[in-house]
């Protein structure tokens, strides 16, 4: 109950801060950064993954729904899914403050988290997301992505993501300060005016520290290399 009150308080604070802004044209959009199949030499480990946003609002305040997850294609099972409801308000020319709530699926303990963070463009046009997830088992996440234009139609997008649990969570097989690192590179072809872009690439992930020990104790690998094929969509 206390956690819910805190989350609602954060959202209310952001809305109140924007209440004095004059009416502006409404903007909206959908951007799916990743909609892909990830392949390994073992079909049991192949997954379908997605990561996308939908937003509506103005330049001064945006409401964003973010979804990402993985689905085991071989076993026909949802492995993880994360849904965030976020409010974003500019704090500088290139960065927004973020406040919201995150829901994890499948159901389990501590599946609701408050979200505090920043989102924007760093120098040299690196897209940055830095979020703190507040709950009984808090964690932090840092993401960086860069779009390198090779030709008018070909774009190489390297990315890196670091998840750091701040407390043990045996249900999720993560240990405090045992981070998970994900690194990828995707080469896309602009098929329809940046709205549809098929891509291929590689994706590597690895866990460290006590999280690695937990995985190995369950007979699981601590890392994985995937070849990926998918679509980027923007409307």
Indicate residue ranges for each PLM-predicted region.
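Outer-membrane beta-barrel channels and translocator barrels
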Residues: 59-61, 88-94, 121-125, 149-153, ...
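A contiguous pocket-lining binding segment that forms or flanks enzyme active sites
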Residues: 126-175
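Outer-membrane beta-barrel initiation region
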Residues: 21-74, 89, 227
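Extracellular loop and loop/strand-boundary signature of outer-membrane beta-barrel proteins
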Residues: 70-72, 103, 129-130, 168-173, ...
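Outer-membrane beta-barrel "beta-signal"
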Residues: 185-191, 222-235
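Outer-membrane beta-barrel proteins
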Residues: 74-78, 108-111, 139-141, 155, ...
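Residues that define the transmembrane beta-barrel architecture of outer-membrane proteins
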Residues: 46-50, 79-83, 110-114, 136-140, ...
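Transmembrane beta-strand segments that form the barrel wall of outer-membrane beta-barrel proteins
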Residues: 30-38, 61-72, 95-105, 118-135, ...
């Amino acid at each position: 109950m206390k956690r819910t009150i805190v989350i609602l308080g954060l959202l209310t604070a952001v809305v109140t801060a924007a209440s004095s802004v004059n009416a502006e044209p409404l903007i909206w959009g959908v951007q799916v950064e990743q909609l892909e199949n990830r392949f390994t030499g073992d079909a049991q480990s192949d997954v379908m993954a997605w990561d996308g946003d939908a937003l509506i609002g103005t330049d001064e305040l945006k409401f964003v729904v973010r979804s990402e997850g993985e689905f085991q294609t071989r076993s026909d099972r949802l492995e993880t899914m994360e849904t965030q409801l976020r409010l974003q308000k500019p704090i500088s020319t290139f960065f927004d403050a973020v406040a919201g709530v995150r829901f994890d699926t499948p159901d389990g303990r501590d599946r609701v988290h408050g979200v505090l963070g920043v989102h924007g463009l760093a120098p040299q046009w690196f897209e940055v997301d830095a979020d703190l997830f507040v709950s009984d088992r808090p964690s932090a996440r840092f993401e960086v992505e860069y779009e390198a234009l090779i030709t008018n139609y070909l774009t190489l997008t390297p990315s890196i993501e670091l998840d750091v649990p701040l407390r043990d969570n045996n249900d999720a097989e993560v240990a405090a300060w045992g981070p998970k690192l994900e690194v990828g590179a995707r080469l896309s072809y602009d098929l329809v005016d940046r709205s549809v872009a098929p891509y291929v690439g590689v994706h590597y992930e690895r866990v460290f520290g006590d999280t690695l020990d937990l995985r190995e104790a369950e007979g699981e690998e601590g890392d994985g290399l995937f070849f990926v094929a998918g679509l980027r969509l923007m409307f």
